[in-house]
Amino acid sequence: MVMLRSLLVSALAALAAGSPIAEPADQSLEARQLGSSNDLTNGACKDVTLIFARGSTEMGNMGTVIGPPLCSSLKSKLGADKVACQGVGGLYTGGLMQNALPQNTDPGAISTAKSLFEQASTKCPNTQIVAGGYSQGSAVIDNAVQQLSAEVKDKVKGVVFFGFTRNLQDKGQIPNYPKDNVKVFCAMGDLVCDGTLIVTAAHLTYTINAPEAASFLASKVQSA
């Protein structure tokens, strides 16, 4: 697996020209199981709506590394009947090559995420929106939030990033969005957070951060 990652990084480095890139999550059978949630698009409105974008090559629309654990932790803290979890699917394919684009993902992925924020605002006008992104998914959410109207952006109470691929470029925050409402998790040794193409084992460790991230989002919702 180490050799595979090295080959992928080497092959994409020339194309990326210094842009950070996320690599596949755990290749085990368990990690290949689908992880999806469509509480917003298919379910009833809840007090809180979590919109999450998975990392490159992760299955489903929530992935496996941190999406489902974050959803579960947030429901545990706020109540399962109070939280809707929605993964970003559609035009966001989680492909590796998209990491090399200027926004570290592609316009279709950003548009898909943006539409989910807007759907949450219109379908559920009283819901409080929170969001999260892992690896390439962090770039998806970062760019989507930047493009929201002031009205919708005001409903986004908190955002968490894991292995933030635009951490260096955007200085650990989302441009034109309150810095105090963003929490970035960068594991020690995760060089993706330093704006490099070097993917280490640390990039796959964010499952353990689910409770802390959920606590942060819950605190933003409760103080709103």
From Swiss-Prot:
Disulfide bonds join C45-C124, C71-C85, C186-C193. InterPro entries: AB_hydrolase_fold, Cutinase/axe, CUTINASE_1, CUTINASE_2, Cutinase_monf. It is an enzyme of class 3 (hydrolase). The active site is at S135, D190, H203. SMART domains: Cutinase. Its EC number is 3.1.1.74. GO terms for biological process: carbohydrate catabolic process. The keyword Lipoprotein does not apply. GO terms for molecular function: cutinase activity. It catalyses: cutin + H2O = cutin monomers. The record marks S56, Q136 as: Transition state stabilizer. Gene3D superfamilies: alpha/beta hydrolase. It holds the Pfam family Cutinase. Residues 1-18 form the signal peptide. Keywords: Disulfide bond, Hydrolase, Secreted, Serine esterase, Signal. It is found in: Secreted. GO terms for cellular component: extracellular region. Catalyzes the hydrolysis of complex carboxylic polyesters found in the cell wall of plants. Degrades cutin, a macromolecule that forms the structure of the plant cuticle. Belongs to the cutinase family. This is Probable cutinase 3. It comes from Aspergillus oryzae (strain ATCC 42149 / RIB 40).
